[in-house]
Amino acid sequence: NTPNEYERTLAVLKKTMDLQSAAVDEDFNPCELNDEELYELMRNVADDFGIVNPFPDKERFYDIYRTLKNFEDVTWTDIIEYGDRRFKFRIPEALIDEMEKNFIEGFQEVLIPEAEKFSPCLERLVEAHGDSHFMLTTMDNFYYKILNEMFSDNEMVDVKQTSIYEYEFTSEKFDLILAVPIFGVRDKADEQSTFICREYDMIAAENLALHLKSEGILSIVLPAKITFGGGRVKELREFLQSMYCIKEIAELPSGIFENTAVKAYLLTITTGRTDEVTIKRYVTNTKNPRKDGIGRLVVQDDTFVLEDELTDMGDWNVDRIFESQDEDWIRFQESNVKKQELGTVASIFRGKAVSHKDPTGNIGVVNISNIGEYEIDYSSLDHLEEEERKVTNYLLKDGDLLIPARGTAIRVAIFKEQIYPCIASSNVIVIRAIDESLSITYLKLFFDSPLGRKMLITRQQGTAVMNISYKELNNIEIPLPSVEEQKQIADTYTREFEVYKKTIQEAESRWSSVLAELQERI
């Protein structure tokens, strides 16, 4: 967060008013500063805050100062909160309430980095746990001054201007760390960084864990990438699991933060001992948290896995953990039906990125919006002008199964060959049977089933918007009965679907006729 001009100006005015209220004469009696003394005091305060004089016009300063004196006291928390919330990252109070549950009775050394994000709950936290000693950090000089003012009379609070994205930001260790680091930004640490990852959120997780005391707890919010990412992110997961104990992994609801759609998780990491890892999925008690706010977080699903089991999984996929304990999944695993990984009977690939559209182009492009619940809408395809040989590897074939890779809903439809060549856009996944051992119609029916839909959902790479990895689909284990049984199922589906469409068309036609007759009588 970066303080805005209004925050800075309010801070200068408040500090000036506080100093004026505390002013005394030679006999230590309260005294009123004259206008010149007051203006000079304001300039000194601005300089102390590292701010350019916000009132070069003296008369404007006097007018605003006198006006503010007639209002209720402005608090330092009010100043941090002031400004357009769209440009301020704030942690919802409901989330802070969950993080606060890690406090224990008695004295603790507590670290809250980038503490300005925790307003307006910061003062409440410190007051509620008055037996503990708090270190509050911030990277910003202005917020450093504000936090010092906020807790100037509290000996149990120290404020430090430092960065948790640098080694040895402090030499101290803590019993409890509550952190919501920078995430959802493209900036990374330079390549000379000695941390495992270059992303700032991942750096924070590694660095803060190093500052835990024995039996210490780190409660940290991280983007979903920590649960599934490969490469260095996977190395970080392995580091955390080998050096510490993962106590809890909790999926946070989409839209919990006002100014980012990044899917996030609340992780609880400890230097203590634990054999079980609690797995949770939170929802909000309001339907639309962005519009209605969040009263509290409610646990929708709750289970656990053994720490060794989590290590063997290779990732922290919460959906997959719940799937493995789902009744439909257990029945499927225990059934005698033949099971096969999808990648062994089908080829799976992403469509092609299309940068230039041409309404009169020779090649049709199937986008997510064209994929319906049952069929593809060919009437509204985009088109591309391109030599067919240049898109040969992407040309769709009759019977290909198309699934949106991104979006808000999972739909599965079978491509029917058109009189012109077609390709899928890059946001569409194509599944093509390698041979006759797999019926694509049967596969569509399976993916439309509750179990099949759950399997697709667990292959999402956690973001607020659906994002399915086509590579992950290779590993989905599907029921694969005999070719004859698949054909019987597919034939019945196709036949009855045609009856369904005809029935709908006849009903719509009849309804239109009835409406027309009734309207003529009006």
For each predicted feature, which ranges?
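Flexible, glycine-/basic-rich loop-and-beta segments that form/coincide
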Residues: N259-K338
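A short glycine-rich beta-alpha junction/loop motif
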Residues: L267, P421-I429, Q461-K487
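A short beta-sheet element
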Residues: T392-Y394, L401-F447
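Conserved S-adenosyl-L-methionine
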Residues: Y82-A179, G184-R186, P223-A224
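Non-catalytic DNA-recognition/assembly elements of restriction-modification systems
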Residues: F304-D358, S482-I522
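Sequence-specific dsDNA recognition surfaces
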Residues: Q340-V354, S369-D398
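Long recognition/docking surfaces used for binding and targeting
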Residues: E5-D84
